[in-house]
């Protein structure tokens, strides 16, 4: 299948890019930590083909709900190669995961109570999530004056110590892991240094004996001018006390692994002139490439139908999407840019993270997804239709 024949809108996965990101991060980890691994953040992009590639390249599945836990098992992850985080664990999958030897990080009080229902004829190891307030721990990386967190147990409030005490009282449960994930706005190496120093002090005060430390995610991928995987790992190592350098180090990248591996293509379908602007309508939507509606520009290219015979636009061009929402506007080209016409293709790059996962079933259902592999371009998820939409419904 040729790229010019693809039905738009669509996503295209670069398989080689995804694998390269995983392997380069893994290589960086093992340059400092013999005991380390990547937990791929399933929520960032849960496309089954992506999950299979992550699994086949040595990643664990980092999941944050009972749905994601079941999905990870369904696509073939070893039951011991799952990191189970977040507040949306079900009791049955929580107990199953602990019993099967997955890395389960306790998030709240109800999960501690669930531990009491495990069989008493053996011992179990679990992790616990520590609350990270960026404003207090690394204020230069804070997004606001009070960059607190609703996740994990707070050491300052005493709830972390209370949680440890409750777990210890159960008798056959050991805290062997710590989860300290926060994603700073800056994604700086310095942030992770500060968090590691903060947490290491708590590990010492609470006399924890850790098998693993889950540092979470929030890293840049391979981008010019941004920290590299190696710089992050060097920062981890330098901040860790020597007494903790033999602990298994876990990272949970999502964006850093999958963002650069996806493009999104959409086609210009109509052009109108009014109110001092040119309105360019496409068959794509901002919902697919910027679901938080925060971006002001994108990594993008244009594939023009007749590039040599194209005039310049005398007015600004407003590039908009397929939906009926007025604010489905992606970006604006200034006057003097090449005038877009029907049939032109706009290609968005680095759109693999929190895009497909958050695309709504609004007006247009999920688009085609292709993979660019040594075998050529292959369809790996067919565009949804009304049959996909209504399955499971009674009407």
Which residues make up each language-model segment?
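Active-site-proximal loop/turn and secondary-structure-junction residues that shape catalytic pockets
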Residues: 44-46, 67-68, 88-90, 108-110, ...
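A charged N-terminal "starter" segment
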Residues: 1-118, 122-124, 161, 168-174, ...
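Structural beta-strand/beta-sheet cores of well-ordered domains, especially the beta-sheet scaffolds
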Residues: 9, 102, 124-126, 149, ...
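Glycine-rich, aromatic-flanked loop segments that form ligand/cofactor-binding clefts
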Residues: 121-135
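Active-site loop/helix belt of alpha/beta enzymes
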Residues: 133-271, 363
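Charged (often Lys/Glu-rich) extended helix/loop segments that serve as interaction or gating elements
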Residues: 2-3, 235, 248-395
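Conserved, mostly hydrophobic/aromatic
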Residues: 18, 43, 65, 97, ...
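Solvent-exposed alpha-helices and their adjacent loops that cap or buttress functional pockets
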Residues: 76-77, 96, 119-121, 143-145, ...
């Amino acid at each position: 299948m040729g790229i010019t024949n693809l039905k738009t809108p669509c996503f295209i996965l670069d398989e080689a890019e995804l694998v390269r990101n995983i392997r380069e991060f893994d290589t960086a980890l093992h340059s400092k930590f013999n005991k380390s691994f990547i937990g791929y953040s399933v929520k960032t992009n849960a496309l089954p083909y992506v999950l299979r590639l992550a699994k086949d390249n040595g990643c664990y599945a980092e999941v944050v709900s009972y749905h994601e836990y079941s999905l990870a098992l369904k696509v073939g992850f070893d039951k011991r190669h799952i990191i189970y985080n977040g507040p949306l664990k079900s009791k049955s999958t929580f107990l199953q995961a602990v019993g099967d030897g997955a890395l389960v990080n306790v998030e709240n009080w109800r999960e501690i109570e669930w531990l009491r229902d495990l069989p008493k004829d053996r011992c179990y190891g679990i992790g616990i999530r520590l609350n990270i307030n960026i404003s207090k721990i690394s204020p230069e990386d804070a997004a606001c004056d009070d960059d607190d967190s609703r996740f994990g147990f707070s050491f300052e409030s005493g709830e972390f110590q209370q949680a440890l005490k409750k777990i210890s009282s159960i008798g056959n449960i050991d805290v062997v892991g710590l989860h300290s994930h926060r994603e700073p706005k800056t994604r700086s190496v310095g942030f992770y240094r500060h968090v590691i120093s903060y947490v290491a002090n708590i590990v010492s005060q609470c006399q924890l004996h850790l098998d693993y430390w889950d540092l979470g995610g929030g890293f840049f991928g391979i981008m010019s001018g941004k920290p590299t995987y190696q710089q992050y790992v060097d920062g981890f190592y330098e901040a860790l006390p020597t007494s903790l350098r033999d602990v298994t180090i876990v990272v949970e990248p999502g964006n850093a692994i999958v963002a650069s591996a996806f493009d999104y293509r959409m086609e210009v379908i109509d052009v109108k002139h009014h109110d001092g602007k040119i309105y360019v309508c496409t068959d794509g939507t901002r919902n697919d490439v910027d679901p938080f509606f925060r971006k002001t520009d994108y990594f993008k290219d244009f594939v023009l139908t007749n590039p040599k015979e194209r005039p310049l636009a005398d007015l600004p061009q407003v590039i908009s999407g397929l939906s009926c929402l007025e604010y489905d506007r992606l970006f604006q080209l200034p006057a003097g840019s090449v005038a877009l016409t029907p049939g032109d293709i706009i290609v968005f790059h680095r759109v693999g993270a929190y895009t497909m996962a958050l695309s709504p079933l609004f007006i247009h259902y999920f688009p085609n997804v292709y993979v660019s592999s040594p075998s050529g371009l292959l369809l790996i998820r067919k565009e949804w239709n009304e049959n996909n939409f209504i399955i499971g419904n009674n009407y």
